[in-house]
């Protein structure tokens, strides 16, 4: 168990400028992978008033309409009219994408695909906890669900005055390592100029917060901050610049676990920043699902051009039923953590990445089919081999 009495995590909506950038990068990755599953893609996006700027390195046989994909993605997020300050049909799209360095390619590609080297050096973490049904930390799980609900109400038209940009933050109280109460909720949402703050706060409380958060964790002392600065009409790329990879804690575990520093969006599976982080989640989740530990953090590290991980480490925070040595041996036996092994173990060579770019890459309820790293199909054999 952890020693926190209070722990806070945040999430942001699909209309947050950094998340816009992530979605554009992953939309381009998906479009390329529909034509070329073995493309090398590292696509970065910058969004600011009136412009989308693309940069990075892509080597592919695919022939895609980059500008159209960018515009369609921006429009689908909800920035489709000048009244919102950003219009996918009229914004500038500036393309500065080049090709992957041949020096990197020679370190990754191999005659035998199973010997594929890591696309870069680096360290990645995976994490799981039994404090929620999806084996995620409760603060980030609740924050994501608040943001999903905001999007649902905006897209359905139930709350017509909602706009795409929003943020949520949830502070949980822990007792003996278990969530016992929600201490504070912060929710800020962009809105049309003609909604009063009183009406907005009531609607957010009744239709978002109370709809999402467990009633047994809310109490008389729970503090609510709904649009605490008042008006939030100017948002999205007009209010702030957005860049791919700036919401890596939102994307993962809300700060409850460590992070190796590498972002996910816009990267094909040869980039271990992404694929090994997914594998780390898969390993940790199966360890917890198997009952080997109540909490598990897995670290994996790589050297560029080398297939085998340079290290595999685990931390179970004193909750394990077997030793760390036993768990690591089980990991080595049942999980292929070479880049090629990860790609095929998790079926990562498919165009499904744009859907990961909002509301977290991990712990999405009902996502096990699309997000293969959320499966717990190794739990039974891990439990059997651990003799517990």
UniProtKB/Swiss-Prot annotation:
| Annotated residues for binding of ATP | 16, 165-167, 231-232, 240, 246-247, 263, 267
Give the intrachain disulfide bonds.
none
Entry keywords, A to Z: ATP-binding, Cytoplasm, Magnesium, Metal-binding, Nucleotide-binding, One-carbon metabolism, Potassium, Transferase
The enzyme's main class, written as a single word, is transferase
Q: Name one GO cellular component term.
A: cytoplasm
Keyword Transferase among UniProt keywords:
yes
The record ties this protein, via SUPFAM superfamilies, to: S-adenosylmethionine synthetase
UniProt: Mg(2+) binding residues: 18
Q: Which InterPro entries match?
A: ADOMET_SYNTHASE_CS (IPR022631), S-AdoMet_synt_C (IPR022630), S-AdoMet_synt_central (IPR022629), S-AdoMet_synt_N (IPR022628), S-AdoMet_synthetase (IPR002133), S-AdoMet_synthetase_sfam (IPR022636)
| Binding-site positions, L-methionine | 57, 100, 240, 271
Q: What subcellular locations does the record give?
A: Cytoplasm
| Pfam family name, one | S-AdoMet_synt_C
Q: In which pathway does it act?
A: Amino-acid biosynthesis; S-adenosyl-L-methionine biosynthesis; S-adenosyl-L-methionine from L-methionine: step 1/1
Paste the cofactor note: Binds 2 divalent ions per subunit.
Residues bound to K(+) are 44
Q: What is its main location?
A: cytoplasm
Q: Which GO terms describe its biological process?
A: one-carbon metabolic process; S-adenosylmethionine biosynthetic process
Q: Which cofactor does it need?
A: Mg(2+); K(+)
Role description: Catalyzes the formation of S-adenosylmethionine (AdoMet) from methionine and ATP. The overall synthetic reaction is composed of two sequential steps, AdoMet formation and the subsequent tripolyphosphate hydrolysis which occurs prior to release of AdoMet from the enzyme.
Q: Which family does it belong to?
A: Belongs to the AdoMet synthase family.
**What name goes with this protein?**
S-adenosylmethionine synthase
Task: List the source organism.
Answer: Psychrobacter sp. (strain PRwf-1)
């Amino acid at each position: 168990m952890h020693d926190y009495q209070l722990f806070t995590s945040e999430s942001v909506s699909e209309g947050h400028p950094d998340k816009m950038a992530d979605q554009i990068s992953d939309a381009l990755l998906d479009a390329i992978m529909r034509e070329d599953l073995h493309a090398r893609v590292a696509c970065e996006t910058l969004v600011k008033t009136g412009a989308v700027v693309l940069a990075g390195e892509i080597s592919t046989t695919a022939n895609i309409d980059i500008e159209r994909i960018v515009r369609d993605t921006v429009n689908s997020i909800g920035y489709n009219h000048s009244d919102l300050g950003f219009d996918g049909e009229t914004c500038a799209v500036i393309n500065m994408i080049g090709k992957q360095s041949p020096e990197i390619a020679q370190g990754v590609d191999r005659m035998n695909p199973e010997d594929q080297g890591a696309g870069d050096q680096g360290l990645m973490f995976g994490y799981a906890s039994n404090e929620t049904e999806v084996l995620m930390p409760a603060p980030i799980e609740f924050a994501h669900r608040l943001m999903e609900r905001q999007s649902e109400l905006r897209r359905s038209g139930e709350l017509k005055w909602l706009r795409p940009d929003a943020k949520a933050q949830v502070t949980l109280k822990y007792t003996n390592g278990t969530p016992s109460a929600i201490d504070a909720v912060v929710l800020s949402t962009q809105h049309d100029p003609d909604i009063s703050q009183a009406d907005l706060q009531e609607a957010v409380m009744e239709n978002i917060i109370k709809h999402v958060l467990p009633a047994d964790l809310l109490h008389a002392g729970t503090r609510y901050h709904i649009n605490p600065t008042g008006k939030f009409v100017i948002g999205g790329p007009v209010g702030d610049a957005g860049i791919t990879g700036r919401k890596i804690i939102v994307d993962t575990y809300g700060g409850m676990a460590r992070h190796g520093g590498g972002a996910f969006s816009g990267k094909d599976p040869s980039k271990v920043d992404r694929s090994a982080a997914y594998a780390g989640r898969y390993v940790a989740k199966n360890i917890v699902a198997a009952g080997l530990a109540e909490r598990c953090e897995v670290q994996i590290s790589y050297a560029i051009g080398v297939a085998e991980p340079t290290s595999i480490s685990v931390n179970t925070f004193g909750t394990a039923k077997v030793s760390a040595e036993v768990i690591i041996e089980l990991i080595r036996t049942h999980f292929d953590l070479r880049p090629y092994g990860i790609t095929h173990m998790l079926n990562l060579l498919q165009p499904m990445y744009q859907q990961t770019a909002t509301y977290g890459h991990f712990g999405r309820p009902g996502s096990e089919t699309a997000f293969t790293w959320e499966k717990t199909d190794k739990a039974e054999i891990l439990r059997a081999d651990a003799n517990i």
